[in-house]
Amino acid sequence: MSDTAPLTIAVLLGSVRVDRQGIKAARLLVSALEKRGHEAVLVDPMEIRLPLLDRMYKEYPKGGAPAELEQLASLYRRADGFLLVSAEYNHGVPPALKNLLDHFLEEYFWRPSAIACYSAGGFGGVRAAMQLRMILGELGMPSIPSLFSIPRIGEALADDGQPKDERTTKQMERFLDEFEWYAHALRRQRASGTPY
């Protein structure tokens, strides 16, 4: 596989709230990745409707997991990276995102993650992002150094998800440049073998 071959990126949205704003950011990022020639698959907990975690995917007998988990496992195994779109609820990670993440483990290994975070206020979700970094490292998909933080998301993105200002666009492009670099680098390294 060439160094510049298109990547497969799973874009995990972390909100199921009514009138959620994160869907605009998720669609923006999916579109931006596709414009770069990559396959970007939106994983939306509003559509998937996973149950609250009582058994991880790996704890089901082979072929016995619910269809939704089998589909996600298949996507995650072929993914080159994970881009998380997270709100900040009470200074923390949204429960829908944590539930979505916790159903899997080995499927994430040796792949980078990137965090796009947002809020209605001025902090842009960064407090949730700091918690996510610890979680993602433990799940085996360390996050890249940069964040794509969107403060005042209702003002920053139009209804169709397009940025209303140049700063947001520039920040997103730089963030995606960095994420691509890590995804290509770790894909090369996975191809040559993993520690276990």
Segments predicted by a language model, with ranges:
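Short, surface-exposed connector motifs at secondary-structure boundaries
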Residues: D80-F82, R111-A114
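A glycine- and small-aliphatic-rich helix-loop capping segment at beta-alpha/alpha-beta transitions
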Residues: N99-E107, M134-E138
